[in-house]
């Protein structure tokens, strides 16, 4: 049976386990958002992934010297179900990367990589795109996307300037594990202190202790070893024989006639009388 100290510790460990499980669920990467673990800042790019109507926006980017224009989405596909970025070549869409929803910090640069596009000209690698996000609070649109360069007609670099690329203090509802654990520990300590201070007086008031001289039932022996010890203890106890007043000296108490006489006359006395 757990002691009074073990029960509170078990409750505390159970609460700590629940906190860690909840924290593990919170640590799953959010959609199109990232936290800078070195500074604690939080960036949410999800507003760039959908319009007010909920449909994914199409970001049109001029290729200028490349000779083609590009269409891309941020964490979504501009086609709804297709590549995250593409360009048109003689009426055919050429994929330059599949959808990815997890931005990352590369040093101090916030980037989002689309990989797994169509085959590159070398027929070995596949086309990919790198979106480089820049915090800009002065632009009058939700974002401005421009093409920075193309490498071997296989890798494409875009710059995305937006106010949504600016870091916020912290995500809403974000709390540290130590803070949550400390709060639970304080509540647990307060409840345990109240229980220790109030439980004993209430128990004495509503369930008064029995007096010491009140007869109590002795606990029955359990287990074969305890029963064996109890049997030999009873066998070793001295017994007092019962004699009839009319029995001759030396007459055994187990005599049938003496027992019948005892029942008829009820004239008995103990051997110590």
Swiss-Prot record:
Residues 30-168 form the MRH domain. GO terms for biological process: protein transport; vacuolar transport. Residues 1-24 form the signal peptide. Residues 195-273 are cytoplasmic. Glycans are attached at residues 36, 51, 69, 153. One of its GO terms (cellular component) is Golgi apparatus. Keywords: Disulfide bond, Endosome, Glycoprotein, Golgi apparatus, Membrane, Protein transport, Signal, Transmembrane, Transmembrane helix, Transport. Belongs to the MRL1/IGF2R family. This is Mannose 6-phosphate receptor-like protein 1.
